[in-house]
Swiss-Prot record:
The keyword Transferase appears for this protein: yes
Keyword ATP-binding: yes
Record GO cellular component, one term: cytoplasm
Name listed for the protein in its UniProt record: Pantothenate kinase
Family designation: Belongs to the prokaryotic pantothenate kinase family.
Organism of this sequence: Cutibacterium acnes (strain DSM 16379 / KPA171202) (Propionibacterium acnes)
Residues at which ATP binds: G105, S106, V107, A108, V109, G110, K111, S112
Designated gene of the protein: coaA
Pfam families registered for this protein in UniProt: PRK (PF00485)
Location of the protein in the cell: Cytoplasm
């Protein structure tokens, strides 16, 4: 794991730092603390395209992570109750607001699979909480707006999102609004779906997955600092890997999509389905070099140190190390 000096994780662990590093083997031992599990059929449904996440990964990596998040959730609830008692708000019947989890990481690193796995596993934890999942793709500006602003070639960069709408969505959720809506995005048409909305109705846990969810606050024109999405997270996960591995996974996924989603007559990328493999690989590399790669280096990777947990994957897509922020 190549960590820059500015990242608050120590490569050699010889100096005290804000993170605890655990090898996969050490982390897997913690799996015995819970019996939460899923079957192969459910895992098949959850896995992303080309993602080789196995049942062994579920047991050794995601089960301990689920238990850790459950502990955070329980203690957050206890703190909420204690604070209400101290402030004498109990008589007002204030309801606890959703526990919000952010999942960040590069394109093609497998963060969507991690988000879906956690939704399934957390929903099976004690007390059977209601768990919703929202991706930030729905808060991308429609292609029409991106074209008007000459941002279509920067889709996925922070400025391509309606950040005010996304922040308002999370603020409303954390404020206890009974019903909050989010736009819906189609990976087939590569655009926002008109007249469709995802409705979130006070779940116990809300998972928000996206490239830039751990971005720090921006400075307003007045010079004051604004709010960041991550200000409202109770727990966050960064899915990490070496860029060379992510590029390879991205190209392989691109080639697979040519035989699946790209063949849909409504697909925005239909022309790629008819290309020879060598041309498709060239296009995929170009997209990475001009969009996904620069976005990773400039915007996504620098937020890694802001996460509560970092899952670092090896070349085979398996999590090799886990970093947990010290409480």
């Amino acid at each position: 794991m190549n960590l820059t000096p500015t990242t608050p994780v120590d490569d050699d662990n010889t100096e005290p730092g804000p993170f605890i590093e655990l090898s996969r083997e050490s982390w897997a031992v913690l799996s015995d603390s819970t019996e939460i599990d899923i079957d192969e059929a459910t895992l098949d449904h959850i896995r992303g395209l080309g993602d080789p996440t196995s049942h062994r990964d579920v047991v050794e990596v995601y089960r301990p992570l689920t238990q850790l998040i459950h502990l955070y959730c329980m203690h957050t609830g206890a703190l909420f109750d204690a604070s209400n008692n101290f402030l004498q708000l109990t008589r007002h019947g204030m309801k606890r607001t959703p526990f919000v989890i952010g999942i960040a990481g590069s394109v093609a690193v497998g963060k969507s699979t991690v988000a879906r796995l956690l939704r399934e596993l957390l929903g099976r934890s004690p007390r059977r909480p209601v768990v919703d999942l929202v991706t930030t793709d729905g808060f991308l500006y429609p292609n029409r707006v991106l074209e008007e602003r000459e941002l279509l070639s920067r889709k996925g960069f922070p400025e391509s999102y309606d950040r005010k709408a996304l922040l308002r969505f999370v603020v409303d959720v954390k404020s206890g609004m009974p019903e909050v809506t989010a736009p819906v995005y189609s990976h087939v048409t590569y655009d926002i779906v008109p007249n469709q909305q995802l409705v979130v109705r006070q779940p116990d846990i809300l998972i928000i997955e996206g490239l830039n969810v751990l971005q720090p606050p921006r400075r307003r024109s007045s010079g004051t600092m604004g709010l960041a999405l991550s200000d409202f997270f109770d727990f966050s996960v960064y899915v990490d890997a070496e860029e060379a591995d992510i590029i390879r996974w991205y190209i392989n996924r691109f080639l697979t999509l040519r035989q699946t989603a790209f063949t849909d007559p409504h697909s925005f990328f239909g022309e790629y389905a008819r290309m020879p493999d060598n041309e498709a690989i060239t296009i995929a590399k170009e997209i990475w070099d001009t969009i996904n790669g620069p976005n990773l280096v400039q915007n996504v990777l620098p937020t890694r140190g802001r996460a509560t947990a970092i899952l670092h994957k090896g070349p085979d897509h398996e999590v090799r190390n886990v970093w947990i922020r010290k409480v």
